[in-house]
Amino acid sequence: MVPLLLLLAAPLLAADWTQFRGPNGSGVSDAKGLPDEFGPSKNAIWKTALPPGHSMPVFSETRIFLTAYDADGKLWTICLNREDGKVLWRREAPRPRNQELHKANSPASPSAVTDGRNAYVFFTDFGLLSYGPDGEERWRLPLGPFNNPFGMGASPVLAGDTLLQICDSESGSFFAAFHKDTGKLKWRVERPDVARGFSTPVLYQPNGGELQVIVPGSYRLVSYSVATGERIWWTSGLTWQLKPTPVMDRDRIYVLGWAGGSDTGQQEDIAPFEDVLKTWDANKDGALAKEEIPDPKIVKDWSSVDLDRNGVLGARDWQMFRDRRAAQNGLTAFRLGGKGDMTGKSVAWRYTKSLPNVPSPLLYDGVLYLVKEGGLFTSIDPATGEVLKQARLQGALDQYFASPVAAGGRVYVASQGGHVVVLKAGAQWEVLQVNSFDDEIHSTPVPLGNRLYIRTRSALYAFGTP
């Protein structure tokens, strides 16, 4: 990862952790000397009680920013002192609505991003806000409501003075750029051929070219100009719902996508809308009502097919249904760059077995890592897609929402059940320690400096060696 990171802007250096999963979403840190053994009563430097939230903490030189929600339904942005964990301020965000959420999601799932001084946050039930280092509100920008039955999950990203936010939903999807100091819109591009998604974008700086931002979404990967929002290149071949954030090396981007009904062998060839209308559209209104459809599977899954929720299936609904039934899950290695449609030209390899649902992949020291629910951990050769080792993480056979991270020759993996596994990194990885907490963990760990930060449902811990 390091060669690519050196091509990007200064805030993306591996010594920083300013956004979701740190430097360009990689999950890789240059931290060293972190303890293998830690827990509520071992190697804890400090612990700060917090309201719940799935977002991970992000860091400036002296401060920590995160989002949360409380039992009264209030949304919070919280700032802590990095040295001792003391809460410096907390600010309530407006909550004009309470949108539908998946049971595994939360009202405070997207992580904050910081430019080293100010914080920027996104909430499903409001939109974007920015706070100064002392908690003064700099600007606010209402967005939504969003037609996403699972709630939003993608985190904001900074590229220089540009704040980027992807908002993919069943309808009305868009990608927008704002000036970080004013919240003023720079550009907005509509994404009508995209349904719900949760993946945070990553930045790409080609040699001699303009800075780009790569967005995984339904069915395709798209690279946009950071300056203008223009589509520069794109490629098809993704599944219908993207949750993990991709990782990159100098030449390739590794995109993971798993969605229900799209494992290998589950694909179906669905007839075009025009053909279906001829036989099913009894009232000849150019749309399909539920009572006109003889297929019980479609009727049963109505809420997932009627994307705009208007009670009938139109041409877009049906095309998205066709695309969804043809989509295939996979971890795909795409060659970076190009111009225009790169479908059929950019795929280096594809792996379709034992795929995680939510956790992002990790690329560290020449090895790709995946962690799947049930504690199935896999190492893969990024050059070929060959599995190097696959085994269960004994002692942590749990559900996983947090993504793996790496530092100092170690990989850290946190389960929902409160187990944090420390592995010796490598093709033939080894479990060194399974640490246990008496609380759930949804947030991705942060190895930074000489400390390891773990957010549980009720607290943020800083661990280190005495």
Name what the model sees in each region.
Residues 1-11:
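Bacterial N-terminal signal peptides
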Residues 14-466:
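Noncatalytic, solvent-exposed loop/strand surfaces
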